[in-house]
């Protein structure tokens, strides 16, 4: 099997799994309990929180553990909407967002909130002039992905934050899920930020919402204080510790990982550009981990299925998106519905080998010849 879907899920690093198992065996107490075992568990999760905060450049009190980025996005957007409902009911986002953002905004729209989506330029970045046009006194939040999962384009978050300084009632939520481990991530100018461990070689089931200390968001899960008043439940100490380990490894090895992936991306671009019917949708300035392409007149789902039959795993849109609909991100940059329907994504890793790239290109060549001959 050739796995080229690392944007959907990454395999857990052996060192991260070892950390999880060691802490799970050692810390048997509930971190909320007032005895020796509970104190030991609390000390472990506090140490993990301090480490994570240091790596992300935030305060430990700004970290809320969640089950993943989907919960964190729901928590942030619903919490900000409720917090600011007396100031306004207008929210701005983009057509590039993960379904946990777009779905939450749809739910808020059904509750009477007004949602506007930013235009996306041909380079894949949001139109800042359109943002300025859409902003008004009733705008309570802007939700934007730091790096979109389908094209790999990094959005101008710091420029957005600078624009929002003129709107004191408007908060900025950033979904950094795809960015962690691929680019440096900053919380500067941001009010809430989401991420999840399974995108950077950690375990599934643990994520973070980073929240400015002065924001009093209503919890999604009630029931008493845990590691924070904002999320009830017994904290999973080993998962928190494993996230800290995975994040540490991702930050330390970031330059080497990016260099390796960039070389593979360049090889793919060079090889795929020789096919007249292939259109590469990811801009040159996108992160090298993601390469989105279309094969003219062949639906992305069909091409994915043929590659899968040959042992190659790629993705059509986000793994959490609905099937049968064109990619919103690709349509936003190309304005071509047929091209968006034909699009699919290769996502690379520092674990991807040269031999895997060669084998993929061989499988691609066979699929391309077979499928384009039918049209």
Which residues does each PLM region occupy?
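Pyridoxal 5′-phosphate
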Residues: 1-375
């Amino acid at each position: 099997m050739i796995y080229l879907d690392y944007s959907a899920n990454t395999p857990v690093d052996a060192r991260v799994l070892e950390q999880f198992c060691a802490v799970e065996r050692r810390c048997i107490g509930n971190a909320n309990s007032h005895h020796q075992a509970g104190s030991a568990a609390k000390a472990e999760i506090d140490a993990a929180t301090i480490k994570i905060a240091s790596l992300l450049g935030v305060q430990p009190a700004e970290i809320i553990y969640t089950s993943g980025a989907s919960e964190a996005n729901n928590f942030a957007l619903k919490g900000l909407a409720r917090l600011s409902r007396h100031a306004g009911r207008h929210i701005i986002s983009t057509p590039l967002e993960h379904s946990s953002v777009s779905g939450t905004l749809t739910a808020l729209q059904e509750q009477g909130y007004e949602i506007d989506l930013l235009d996306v330029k041909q380079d894949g970045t949001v139109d800042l002039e359109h943002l300025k046009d859409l902003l008004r006194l009733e705008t309570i939040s802007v939700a934007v992905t730091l790096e979109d999962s389908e094209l790999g384009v990094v959005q101008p978050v710091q420029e957005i934050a600078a624009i929002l300084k003129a709107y004191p009632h408007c908060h900025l939520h950033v979904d950094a899920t795809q960015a962690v481990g691929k680019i440096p991530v900053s919380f500067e100018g941001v009010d809430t930020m989401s991420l999840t461990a399974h995108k950077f070689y950690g375990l599934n089931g643990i994520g973070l919402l980073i929240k400015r200390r002065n924001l009093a968001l209503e919890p999604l899960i009630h029931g008493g204080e845990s590691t924070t008043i904002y999320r009830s439940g017994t904290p999973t100490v080993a998962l928190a510790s494993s996230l800290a380990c995975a994040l540490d490894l991702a930050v330390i090895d970031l330059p080497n990982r990016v260099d390796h992936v960039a070389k593979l991306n360049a090889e793919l671009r060079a090889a795929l550009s020789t096919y007249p019917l292939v259109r590469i949708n990811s801009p040159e300035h996108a992160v090298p981990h993601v390469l989105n392409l279309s094969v003219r007149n062949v639906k992305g789902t069909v091409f994915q299925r043929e590659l899968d039959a040959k042992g190659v795993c790629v993705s059509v849109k986000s793994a959490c998106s609905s099937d049968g609909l064109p990619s919103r991100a690709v349509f936003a940059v190309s304005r071509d519905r047929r091209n968006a329907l034909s699009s699919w994504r290769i996502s690379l890793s520092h674990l991807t080998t040269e031999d895997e790239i060669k084998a993929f290109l061989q499988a691609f060549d066979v699929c391309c010849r077979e499928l384009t001959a039918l049209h």
